[in-house]
Amino acid sequence: MNSDLALLRLLQLASPGLPVGGFTYSQGLEWAVEAGWVRGVDSFAGWQREQVHDTLACLDWPVLARLYHACQAKDAEAFGHWSRFLLANRETAELRLEEQQRGAALARLLDGWQLGQAPAWRASLELTQLGGMAWLAAHWAIPLRQLALGHGFAWLEGAVMAGVKLVPFGQQAAQTLLRDLGADLPAALDQALALGDDQLGGGLPLLAIASSRHETQYTRLFRS
């Protein structure tokens, strides 16, 4: 696949229009706002920046890299291992359910394209969204670094759009947040890709608490 087409495929994978339901989740932000932990643009930026460095760089991106390499090597066993590892590191029932629902939605998209149908791969593809993204990126010859940055920006954009509704703040502030927080992504990715297998894993106690409390929050805009 030529580089122009690979770029277009990456934009498709990173698009908020990808039918995986990402816009329906707040990943604990809704409770954090209600609890007063996130009160404005500055505290929102701090909330997201911690996730970039402690979750995205220490868990999601390193696992994405291993899933991608497993796809390139046609190693379904390793792909399944890292898919289960990622799911096990989602710290709450809500976060695990979100991961599985996103993964199942992307797997259905693959079904529609008659891709990823081999039994050795199909069950693992349903477990996580990152698994489907890695599989398609390897299939479409999207370079790993571009895949990771596209995924990171899509995640960040979803969080900022949730912040617009919940904190709230306006579109000017939203674009400034995307500009400023997005500038952290390349260095965080360098850190992520340098980690060994025994260094993987990250957790934020307040995020886990917020997600757990969101499961029973009385009034919610976002899915649990």
Swiss-Prot record:
One of its GO terms (cellular component) is cytoplasm. GO terms for molecular function: nickel cation binding. InterPro entries: UreF, UreF_sf. The gene is ureF. The lineage of its organism: Bacteria, Pseudomonadati, Pseudomonadota, Gammaproteobacteria, Pseudomonadales. Required for maturation of urease via the functional incorporation of the urease nickel metallocenter. It comes from Pseudomonas putida (strain ATCC 47054 / DSM 6125 / CFBP 8728 / NCIMB 11950 / KT2440). Keywords: Chaperone, Cytoplasm, Nickel insertion. UreD, UreF and UreG form a complex that acts as a GTP-hydrolysis-dependent molecular chaperone, activating the urease apoprotein by helping to assemble the nickel containing metallocenter of UreC. The UreE protein probably delivers the nickel. It comes from the Bacteria. It is found in: Cytoplasm. Belongs to the UreF family. This is Urease accessory protein UreF. Pfam families: UreF.
